[in-house]
Curated annotation (Swiss-Prot):
Belongs to the pseudouridine synthase TruB family. Type 1 subfamily. Its EC number is 5.4.99.25. One of its GO terms (molecular function) is tRNA pseudouridine(55) synthase activity. It is an enzyme of class 5 (isomerase). Responsible for synthesis of pseudouridine from uracil-55 in the psi GC loop of transfer RNAs. It comes from Campylobacter curvus (strain 525.92). It holds the Pfam family TruB_N. Keywords: Isomerase, tRNA processing. GO terms for biological process: mRNA pseudouridine synthesis; tRNA pseudouridine synthesis. The active site is at D38. This is tRNA pseudouridine synthase B.
Length: 273
């Protein structure tokens, strides 16, 4: 079964646990998701069954939009409410102070990813190392914050809506916000609203050809050549310039790359549902 859709992950389950629920619900064996949500987080999770898991890397998932609540004064090594180690009782902040912090954290930001994250450290997920207490470091990275709106402030909880680039961490954004205020913060709630154009629509199966953000190309020879994965050259196609292209046929899809006057198959002969 090949399918792709947006699911709504509840809180309290890891993304893998939720995926197993969906596999049982739909009676499938092969499934995957794009963009891990932590157990305390909820919301939009792109899920695919069968061969459609191969298309994740070709989806445009920027910007990612979240609604989150930060707890000002709470310390947590994981940056969320699952590992709180200390809570400081603080006086409420003036709206002007919060607005100054918000405005200073737009555009490209350098940050250190959370140690409790799915980052790969020599073949092991960072969160697994963090849970064992093993010492390690993560490299500084960059994310882009396109917009951020403060929705409400009921001290010590500040709720905001943020739009950021793929790969960015809302927990890291909250840590940067806390530094502007001079105190630790952690997230008490996190919900992913959308990834690019992908939003939850009651698990409606999506048309793979409509959601792939790739230009189309056309092979001028026999379709059997594509099905057999034969070596091809740019002159065999209507468009010869470098790029990644979708080839759509009645029963299957292929993705090719034209680069330096050569053709390579990114994906070949994926059956259409």
């Amino acid at each position: 079964m090949n399918a792709i859709f947006v699911a709504n992950k509840p809180t309290g389950l890891s993304s893998n646990q939720f995926l197993n629920r969906l596999k049982r619900k739909y009676g499938v064996k092969k499934a995957g998701f794009s963009g891990t949500l932590d157990p305390f987080a909820s919301g939009c999770l792109i899920v695919a069954f069968g061969s459609y898991t191969k298309f994740f890397r070709f989806l445009d998932k920027t910007p990612k939009i979240y609604e989150a609540t930060m707890w000002i004064g709470a310390s947590s090594p994981s940056g969320d409410n699952e590992n709180i180690t200390d809570v400081k009782i603080l006086k409420p902040f003036a709206d002007e102070s919060l607005e100054i912090a918000r405005k200073s954290l737009l555009g490209r930001l350098k940050y250190i990813p959370p140690k409790f994250s799915a980052k790969n450290i020599n073949g092991t997920r960072a969160y697994k190392l963090a849970r064992t207490g093993e010492e390690f470091s993560l490299k500084e990275q960059e994310m882009e914050v396109f917009s951020c709106e403060i929705l409400s402030y009921r001290h010590p909880f500040l709720t905001f809506r943020i739009s950021l680039s793929e790969g960015g961490y809302v927990r890291s954004y909250a840590q940067l916000f806390g530094k502007r205020l001079g105190y630790d913060v952690c997230l008490s709630e996190l919900k992913r609203i959308s990834e690019g154009k992908f939003r939850f629509e009651n698990e409606k199966f999506l048309n793979i050809c409509e959601i792939l953000n790739l230009p189309r190309n056309k092979y001028l020879g026999d379709v059997a050549d594509i099905m057999d994965g034969k070596s091809l050259k740019p002159s065999d196609f209507t468009t010869q310039k470098d790029g990644i292209y979708l080839l759509e046929y009645d029963k299957f899809l292929s993705i090719i790359e034209i680069k330096n006057d050569t053709i390579s198959y990114c994906l070949n002969k994926v059956e259409k549902c």
